[in-house]
């Protein structure tokens, strides 16, 4: 049973344009991003949301760990567990594992962010700066360039040929 003065929670579903997502991320009624992802991807919505400089509460697993700084974002611990049989299909095998959060920890963090929003808002601004500084297109271009340089062999390069001059007075034998 949940009681007390709690905020409204809305579940949104459907296809959203980039403009829709930007408006949603920056809407004044949106106070935080909460994602209990099981590890389905690198976490693009979390990365985008960080630019809004609002608190992020997310699973402490998978791709978002590359860009969410635990000093600034709230990471929910958990453990790998088998995919639920009802979710298994030909792409998601029952032998696979996904991440399950520790719900008690998640509840505690949700309440703390709600009660001490200003504190978490300051950390979120630092997370936004961290993203802009370390994950800009320019920075990613530099990093990808370094990886390519280190892992792709040097290819042959075109060079100018210096052939001897042809002597027009040379008589070539006739072939019959």
Question: For the regions a protein language model found, what residue spans apply to each?
Answer:
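Short glycine/proline-enriched, acidic/aromatic patches that form the donor-sugar handling elements
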Residues: 21, 43, 62-67, 81-88
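A short alpha->beta transition loop at the rim of the catalytic pocket in nucleotide-sugar-dependent
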Residues: 29-31, 53, 60
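Short hydrophobic beta-strand element within catalytic cores of glycosyltransferases
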Residues: 55-58, 74-77
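Aromatic "clamp/platform" in nucleotide-sugar-dependent glycosyltransferases that forms part
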Residues: 38
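C-terminal amphipathic helix plus adjacent low-complexity
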Residues: 90-176
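Nucleotide-activated donor-binding/catalytic signature segment of Leloir-type glycosyltransferases, i.e.
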Residues: 1-19, 24, 31
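A short, glycine- and acidic-residue-rich donor-binding loop in the catalytic cores
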Residues: 42-48, 56, 63
